[in-house]
Swiss-Prot record:
Gene name per UniProt: groES
Domain of life according to the entry: Archaea
Family per similarity comment: Belongs to the GroES chaperonin family.
SMART domains: Cpn10
Protein's recorded name: Co-chaperonin GroES
Organism: Methanosarcina mazei (strain ATCC BAA-159 / DSM 3647 / Goe1 / Go1 / JCM 11833 / OCM 88) (Methanosarcina frisia)
Pfam families assigned: Cpn10
Amino acid sequence: MIVKPIGERVLLKHQKKEEVTKGGIYIPESARQEKKEGIVVAVGTFEDGKELPLKKDDHVIYGGYQADEIEIDDEKYIFVDFKDILATVVEE
């Protein structure tokens, strides 16, 4: 199935918070803070039809309170507004 966001929206695969620290300590779900990072799966366009400045597989940090979750083939994805994308993460 191919999902293409409409308008200034971005489809992300949510990056989950680690369940175990690097030192091997388990972190219960109640103590984990939600990590607002994701990998871009698909992007919409600006109202004038121009491409959003993101591409598939970009690692992004997002903010805001509005995100719609969907499930495709047992994988969870979220739609966020482009205005809520705060930064891209570049590995050095």
